[in-house]
A protein has these predicted regions:
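Aromatic- and carboxylate-lined catalytic core of secreted/periplasmic carbohydrate-active enzymes
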Residues: 129, 140, 147, 213-221
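Soluble non-cytosolic domains of exported or imported proteins
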Residues: 31, 136-139, 170
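Short, acidic/polar
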Residues: 5, 138-145, 176-180
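Active-site region of glycoside hydrolase catalytic domains
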Residues: 3-132, 143-163, 185-188
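Generic alpha-helical secondary structure signal
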Residues: 87-91, 112, 121, 136-137, ...
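Charged helix-capping and loop-helix junction motifs
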Residues: 1-2, 34-37, 172-178
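Aromatic-rich peripheral "rim/lid" segments of glycoside hydrolase catalytic domains that contact
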Residues: 167-221
Length: 221
């Protein structure tokens, strides 16, 4: 596949096109992803010695396996990962988190869900709801990926982060503000997910800005 894609895309300069091997690779054994990534990198390098290649971190049981990532070579390779933690907050209101409910109080920073409402969460999320999250806890998690990139001696790019529109607006803004501050502090480039159309969007279908505060946070205004 990547041999064919390289043949098609190599006409475009490196300044315009980079190749991400696979979006959000998932495997019960991260070694599988390391093997596949090495094969793909080798195939691309045989045709394009200097093309920028973006390699994602393998996810196992919803956990990013930063420490398991290996690279066969690091020339013009960039590491990427996505961050949606704590997922109970960022995916608030989904069937998979709150059972589709949006009437259970949730907040950030602080204990995510007040004690008196914990039992209203699906059992799998009750322990998460009892935990305390703030800028420090976000930073600790993000630094796992940032540190791994430093160990590999490659640049790092946070390709996605965001919260659902159903997340209460004050907490949503607080979370975005901390995320952007941490990434800027560590000089890590990033992309917010997403722009419009999906449940995470900040702009409506008619290009209207739905959440001006989030736009200001993301643009540094």
């Amino acid at each position: 596949l990547w041999e064919d894609l390289s043949d098609e895309l190599k006409q475009y300069p490196n300044s315009l096109v980079a190749y991400e091997l696979l979006n959000e690779p998932v495997s019960n054994d991260p070694k599988n992803w390391n093997r596949v990534a090495a094969l793909a990198i080798s195939a691309i390098r045989a045709k394009e010695a200097d093309r920028t290649i973006v390699v994602g971190v393998c996810t196992t049981n919803s956990n990013a396996m930063y420490n398991e990532l290996t690279l066969p070579q690091t020339h013009q390779v960039l590491m990427t990962f996505h961050y949606y933690g704590p997922y109970l907050l960022t995916a608030y209101g989904l069937q998979s988190t709150t059972g589709g409910r949006t009437d259970i109080p949730i907040q950030y920073p602080g204990q995510l869900v007040p004690d008196q409402y914990i039992k209203e969460l699906p059992e799998a999320w009750q322990s998460t709801g009892q935990r305390y999250y703030n800028r420090e806890s976000l930073s600790q998690n993000l630094m796992k990926g940032i540190t791994k990139a430093k160990q590999l001696n490659v640049p790092v790019f946070v390709g996605e982060f965001g919260t659902m529109k159903t997340t209460p607006e004050p907490s949503r803004a607080n979370w975005y503000r901390d995320m952007v501050d941490i990434l800027n502090e560590n000089k890590v480039p990033y992309t917010s997910f997403d722009y419009k159309g999906a449940g995470y969007s900040i702009v409506g279908e008619g290009q209207q800005i739905l959440y001006p505060e989030l736009v200001n946070i993301l643009t540094g205004r």
